Amino acid sequence: MRPAGKVARGVGPRYPHVVVLVGATGDLARRKLLPGLFHLSRAGFIPECRIIGVSLDDLDVEGFRKVARGALDEFSTREVSEADWAAFAAALDYVPLTAGASALQAAVARAEKNFTGESRRLHYLSVPPNAALSCVRMLGQANLVEKSRVVMEKPFGTDLPSAVSLNASLHEVFKEEQIFRIDHFLGKEPAQNILAFRFANGLFEPIWNRNFIDHIQIDVPETLGLGKRAGFYETVGAFRDMVVTHLFQILAFMAMEPPTSLEPTPISEEKNKVFRSMLPIKPADVVRGQYTGYRTEEGINPESDTETFIALKCFIDNWRWAGVPFYLRTGKRLAEGQRIISIAFREPPKTMFPPGSGIGAQGPDHLTFDLADASKVSLSFYGKRPGPGMRLDKLSLQFAMHDTGFIGDVLEAYERLILDAMRGDHTLYTTAEGIEGLWEKAAPLIDAPPPVRPYAPGSWGPNVIHQLIAPHAWRLPFERAWRDPNRLGS
């Protein structure tokens, strides 16, 4: 753990903060938010911070502290010393949601008395979608809008009309610059490394276009099922749950033009240009699937048409990407849990190589980003096998974050995003314009979705996904040598 006060200047927020954590006893708060706030506080990122928990549970302050300590003991990835816990516990307060806006207003006022000078408020709404607007209105009734920012969890609507309506309701209370729509995928270090990789190196950006790139895959299969989210998942499905809020945001990082600076406004504008250039999604370019047994699970309609799997092809119609297909895939109960982006380069002429040389036998050259927490980047290419004759093997160059001395400096996704929200940095957050633009492009799919196709749990989805990507192949599971360079050529 980084000693308090050792954080580089400018990394933390400018002002002390009161964090109002709505849904403070829920699953996300226990797994990610409370451990994240503990680490940010004790590591010196937010040395002046008070946290007010709010939930439907009828607790007092000591009861909430027990919940918080249990969350740290079960889910914290860092050591929790008694001294650090005592300091963190002293910063906690609690207000039952049933106590109303006036009780919350009083608790925030008490917390702010601990600070000298100006302070700010961060409201984190870790609540179900149907409760978000009522919480926003409660914050308005409590006069907690001024000097505040609000963080919201997905989904941000379920189609264009609902997204427009949601944003209009939010803007009745908060200004757009106060609203932070969270995407924890973009908070992960590997996702942020995409921007550094592209724009800090002269090697790849000149070939980052349709002249050199054949296609791009963004592949996020999950082995997990629904867990406790059956009721929520049944109303949204894989497209609304994962593609709009996560995969399209990653696509924007991959496809955007260089911003004028790595600041929130220029980056958001370039992302929105990508969304504006996206062609409407054709239902014929989409495969929807549902794993066998889904309809028999508790809380699921026995005749459900909700997809637990989706694969699609989309296009960005601009000078950089016209004609280059982007293939996206995600789903529940699949063969592996992975998060990769794979860029397939155009293949060179092959006739100069003799028959049997192996040229092209293992697919095109690939640049692959592994978005797991280990943060790997791999470049695969052909090279000559030692010995007589011209025999080619697929070789690989790899980089992994754990190979550097900085792996201990990595913030978890929610930690980074909380810190950014406190600083007013929208770089890794989604705007109202971006969300509404994506729902507009998705309208043809939402209006006329293709039928769901069954697939076996533990598989890679319905077999028809291979027709979707033909004549190419999915990077997973067919080309695996890039994952372990020590096995290459064997």
Please state what every model-predicted region is:
Residues 1-152, 156-490:
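Secretory/organelle targeting and membrane-embedding segments
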